Amino acid sequence: AGPSPDRYLWGNAAFALAACITAAFAKYGWTAAIRGYEGGGAVENLNVYKYRQTNGETVALCPTEVSITDRREKELSDLGFIALIYRKNSDKAAFFSGQTVHKPPVYTSDTANANARISARLPYLLNASRFAHYVKANMRDKVGSFMTADNVSKYLNNWISQYVLLSDDAGDDIKARYPLREARVDVSEDPGNPGAYKCVIFLRPHFQLEELTASIRLVAELPPPAV
């Protein structure tokens, strides 16, 4: 039997996730790169306590209070929980899930369902919130000017275009700095409020790998590749 977990001071994994978010922001200026060992979600240099069992074998105590399997992590993610997953025989762990507690509504349209699922994922939600905050803060400085709806639309579209990367083949670091694949800002006048405008921002991020379903087939002759 190993040492009792009650003898150690455990910390909330939320602080580790917050550290990943702040590290991504400090490096890229955005907070999408917070998942996976290679995607910014790694937690390194964990304290690994090693002890000797009665049979003489040296065993490392898991630095996370609970060792969560991949299957259990997927179940927790589907319920809106982000788990810290320990990599065995190392001093590292990582966050793989980006799901929030918001349950996406189900629609009859595949496009609407896809948009709802994206809106429930933390990396995209953090970036979208930052864009919304900047638009409100920036346009507040324009209050009192003589900008028309077209002027505001051109101004915001020119601004947001600097964060759009059209290439799907760019590296992860480049996509982290330019988090949008497409973007558009629509500005219209508020008929009942002269001088007031309504703004709708459409954001299409660079999608992150969520899961991969693999199948294995044993054949005597390789078939032609699927088109």
Each model region followed by its residue ranges:
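Long, contiguous, structured domain-core segments that constitute the functional module of a protein
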Residues: 2-155, 211-214
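Glycine-centered secondary-structure boundary/capping sites
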Residues: 78-82, 168, 195
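Generic structural hydrophobic/aromatic packing signal, biased to beta-strands
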Residues: 84, 93-95, 135, 183-187, ...
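Active-site lining segments that contact anionic ligands and/or coordinate catalytic metals
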Residues: 90, 130, 156, 180-182, ...
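Intrinsically disordered or highly flexible coil/loop and linker segments, enriched in small
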Residues: 144-148, 161-169, 210
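Long, charged, glycine-rich C-terminal linkers/tails
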Residues: 167-190
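C-terminal edge-of-domain segments
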Residues: 184-227
